[in-house]
Each structure stands twice: as structure tokens, then as C-alpha cells.
Amino acid sequence: MTLRRAVFLAENGIVVQGDAASAGDGRIPRLLPAAGPGLRLLRDAGFAFHVIGNRPCVARGECDEDELRTVARRFERLLEDEGVALTGCSFCPHDPHGVRRDYAVDCLCRLPRPGLLQRAAREHGLDLARSWLIGDSLDEIEAGVRAGCRTVLLDDGRESEWRLSELRLPHHVAEGLGEAALLILEDEHVLDWRRRAADSGRLGVGRG
């Protein structure tokens, strides 16, 4: 089987802040501006997509895994509306300090550990060495680096601690998902500077 390259999308980095915060409130999250066009550029370059995130609400007794499956379907529907298919969504339900004993464990899938990405790669035939992670926290960046991916940090103000180390240094920093897509395509030698200039204007990217 030929392994595919993918872009792992940290859930908080692709939707309007707060939209996907609750598993049980029934809201459909909204994509950030320029996310749809950026993802379509990556889709056209042959990338698969997989959403990841920590969901400790299960361990804390605030939701269950059925509700996480509902969240996953919301993300799938949201991206389908933009013409982008997901291989799936992977959420870590654990929290070492949770109240549900079966989920209050020190697991290998809670970001910044790489277990979510590694499991998705096994289940969906993804090549981690040729894949990228886009996230807006250094814990997400660290998970990508540990898994062997290249990474883009979205500088949207969510990261406040800035505890840097070799594992927490992104390959690129972008102002939004549209710019992140262009940076990835440049690194993959899919995009030259002429197309970058045209697509930057279409995606609302300030530089380029």
C-alpha cells in the first residue's frame, strides 16, 4: 500500500475560537477566514486531512465518547461543505486528573505526545515523514515534531506560555490557515513565487 501524505489539523486552529469547545451543545463550528480556500489548495496538491485534539471532558465526566463521535461528524460535515474530505478525527479523551478512573490515565495520545498522529497514520495509511501538522499551540507543534512531521504554528494569540525547546520549534509560523497552506506548498515545491503572489491576494494573506 502506498502511504499518503497528510495535513493534521489541530481542531482549535481551524475553527472560530470557542465554536468547538463543547461536545454536547449541538453547535456546528465555523471555519476561520481563508481556511476553506487554503485547504482546497492542499487538497489539490494531493494531501489528505485528519483533525486531532485533546478532549479531556470525557475523563472529567462532562461528556462521553458518543458525544466525541458527534463532534467528529460535525467536523466532517463542515469540511465537506468546503469540498474537503477528512480521513477522520482523533481525540484524546484522557486526563490524569480526571474523575472517571478508566480515563484518568497517563496515556500516549494526549498532546503533546504523538500517539494520536501515530494511530491515525496506522489506521489510514499516512506517511508521517511526508506529512504536516498545523496548530496554534506549542503542545500541538511538539506532537507533530515527535511524530516526525513538519509543522506550522498559527500565531493567533492562543499560545501564551511560549515554553520553547527543540521539540517545540515550528518549521514555519503563519498568521492564518491560508498562509500556512501557501508555506507548505512552497516547501513541497508545488508553488512558485508567481502563483504565491496570486494566491496570497485571493486568500487575504498580507505578505507575498
For each feature predicted by the language model, list its residue ranges:
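Asp-based phosphoryl-transfer active-site loop
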Residues: 3-19, 53
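Basic, amphipathic juxtamembrane/active-site segments
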Residues: 20-37
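Short, solvent-exposed loop/turn segments at secondary-structure boundaries
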Residues: 26-27, 61-66, 104-105
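Substrate-recognition element of Asp-dependent hydrolases with the DxDx(T/V) motif
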Residues: 35, 39-78, 82-98, 144
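Conserved Lys-Pro-Asp/Glu-containing loop-to-beta segment of HAD-superfamily phosphomonoesterases
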Residues: 108-138
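Acidic, Mg2+-coordinating phosphoryl-transfer loop and its flanking beta/alpha structural elements
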Residues: 132-172
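Short acidic-hydrophobic, aromatic-tinged amphipathic segments that line or gate anion-handling sites
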Residues: 171-180
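Short, basic, low-complexity termini and linkers enriched in Ser/Thr/Gly/Pro
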Residues: 202-208
